[in-house]
Amino acid sequence: GKRHRRKPNRMSDAEIIVILIHFHSGGFRCFKHYYLHYICKHCKHLFPKTVSYNRFVELEKEVLLQMTAFIKQVLLGECTGISFVDSTPLRVCRNQRILIHRTFEGLASRGKCSMGWFFGFKLHLIINDKGEILNFVFTTGGVDDREPLKEGVLLKNIKGKLFGDKGYIGKTLFESLFIDGIQLFTKVKNNMKNSLMSIADKICLRKRALIETVNDELKNIAQIEHSRHRSFCNFIANALSAIATYCFFEKKPAIDLEFINDGQLSLFEKLYRTHVILDIFYFSFNNS
């Protein structure tokens, strides 16, 4: 058969990942300008074996698995019992260019968010009250916000109370999450009856805008969203490196909360114990 050269890359996977992550933290907006005029000129002592820009773009897709494992295993935060969930659109082109768009043809789809219709993908996030990302997943733009929660993709190591917007309203979803030890709180629609909740839960629900701040930092401080991608792999590499950059931020948006035991969960324990005692009494009474 035809022989292929298996020459190792000049740049290591770690060097490629570091360059991708540093791009989002340096305030740059054009990766080509950043790589050619900053990395290749001013950081030659840190990366002595730099390759051409075209070759570096080709190498990005080879570190996707390593970068994903690095984020999932090292950079994600820990659940504190109070979590916030939301999705944000990642547009790949303007709405006027949807019909002539070719880069993500067959991959991206139309979706609708609070800002209107868009064409692209969705980033689903779960964060804690410290602003740390607990988990994330990418879907096409037309996927319902509740689907990742129904499938359990986002809920690994999540427990306690979960706060979301009106897009997560659903009786079946609430019941399935409650069985798994997660209590879902959402704002009610105008035609719905108001639900009873404690003052602490109402305050946390008002603080749900915390995750909107995280989305804003991912898009404006980092550059997770732009329309200059030329392949799906490089789109994912850019998005993952933006998430990794955010995880390295020393100061994240956070809220100060004090845990208050409102006795909601103990109420279910008391009802269960009462039910068990009544069953025992009924069984002993019939046997006598």
Which residue ranges define each predicted feature?
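Short alpha-helical elements
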Residues: 1-288
